[in-house]
Amino acid sequence: MIYTITFNPALDYISKVDNFEIGKINRTKEEKVLPGGKGLNVSTVLKNLGFQSTALGFIAGFTGKELKTEIEKYGIQTDFIEVKEGITRINVKISSDVETALNGNGPIITEEDIEKLLEQISKFNNEDIVILAGNIPKGIKNNIYEIICSKLEKNGVTFVVDSTKELLINVLKYKPFLIKPNKEELEETFKEKIETNEDIVKRA
């Protein structure tokens, strides 16, 4: 089975506005609400390619329930952990002459919630594939990816990491099957500007 893990999924509220003006009432031309988060995006692409996956991660409140409903409408299996405090974040995307985004913070994830996720992971074996994608919300220790990857490696699980900075660097010793930083994430990780393809190859 393929599993995707998204620590901080979101409902993306996308609105198109002609000539968006700050400080004024703007009428939307088009609106849609979509599940968001790197891991969920991977599950969606896999579904479109004919591969089933199970989406893992944390949800909370009425927005979490809506996120779960929307994901399952796509025919994607879910096994989310419902946390008690806060709501799944809403990210507002305004599309006009330029793109504007307002990203929410997300719910409070406790140590107890983390333990539930680690318990899920402990059942995976060498027939499973795990895709660990995106960043982590505030309050979670930045060694969480390292903890997860050490358990996956111990159980012979194939895993992929799509993240940046310390979250990515700290798991390289566990030899993920694949990492997928884009240009901006490479710049964040190495703390320097990348100008050419040769620069990208050198950092890779």
Regions flagged by a language model, labelled:
Residues 1-23:
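Positively charged, low-complexity intrinsically disordered leader regions
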Residues 4-5, 80, 131-132, 159-163, ...:
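General beta-strand structural signal in soluble alpha/beta enzymes
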Residues 5-9, 58-61, 83, 135, ...:
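Cofactor-binding loop segments of dinucleotide-utilizing enzymes, especially the Rossmann-like FAD-
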Residues 27-87:
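Substrate-binding N-lobe of the ribokinase-like
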Residues 83, 94-126:
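Conserved phosphate-binding/catalytic loop of the ribokinase/pfkB sugar-kinase fold
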Residues 107-110, 136-140, 167-169, 188:
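Short, small-residue-enriched loops and turns at beta-alpha junctions
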Residues 127-139:
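Short acidic, glycine-rich surface-loop motifs adjacent to enzyme active sites
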Residues 146-204:
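Conserved phosphate/ATP/ADP-binding segment of small-molecule kinases
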